[in-house]
Amino acid sequence: MSSANTNTSSAPDAPPRAVMKVAVLAESELGSEAQRERRKRILDATMAIASKGGYEAVQMRAVADRADVAVGTLYRYFPSKVHLLVSALGREFSRIDAKTDRSAVAGATPFQRLNFMVGKLNRAMQRNPLLTEAMTRAYVFADASAASEVDQVEKLIDSMFARAMANGEPTEDQYHIARVISDVWLSNLLAWLTRRASATDVSKRLDLAVRLLIGDQDSA
């Protein structure tokens, strides 16, 4: 045994190396316009990189460089690429929701209106498969550390579907139905991304799921 190994084995246990903890800024804590703009730049950079190279291309240093922020600053806003991509997914759903004119949602019945919204989301997510794959992959495999971001995404999807069904304020039952439809929608989105189902297959499956859950009623 070498002297180096002997010294190591006879020495008292060394204290564990200190790990630097970065205080992460929650979105609600972004008090200044500069902070909000920086967060927007970071998410824009993330989506631009994912659009070209998918999930694997999204590396923290690459995002920091494109967003023109220090890597340490990036980690203060988003502690991992999963947080980045799930937050980007949430922002995309928020944009779709904000652009949707509720008075223009086609259909006189809950079935028709919900089908309209499901189709709208399908078309939006199928425009850029690499970006969608990156955001969806992060969402599916997110752990408890990204629970807040995942919860926000789930609430956004559920709310969009529930409000599409409702003629006014959604009921508790409509929110429950929306949650089931959200799960079915995500499952079929993954099937499309992995080429296990065509866009037509996905549309037919979701139409059937909506029909089975709420029926094709004649009344609103």
From Swiss-Prot:
Residues 36-96 form the HTH tetR-type domain. Keywords: DNA-binding, Repressor, Transcription, Transcription regulation. The keyword Cytoplasm does not apply. One of its GO terms (molecular function) is transcription cis-regulatory region binding. InterPro entries: Homeodomain-like_sf, HTH-type_TetR-like_transc_reg, HTH_TetR, KstR_C. PROSITE patterns: HTH_TETR_2. It comes from the Bacteria. One of its GO terms (biological process) is regulation of DNA-templated transcription. Residues 59-78 bind DNA. PANTHER family: HTH-TYPE TRANSCRIPTIONAL REGULATOR RUTR, HTH-TYPE TRANSCRIPTIONAL REPRESSOR KSTR. Controls the expression of genes used for utilizing diverse lipids as energy sources. Homodimer. This is HTH-type transcriptional repressor KstR. It comes from Mycobacterium tuberculosis (strain ATCC 25618 / H37Rv).
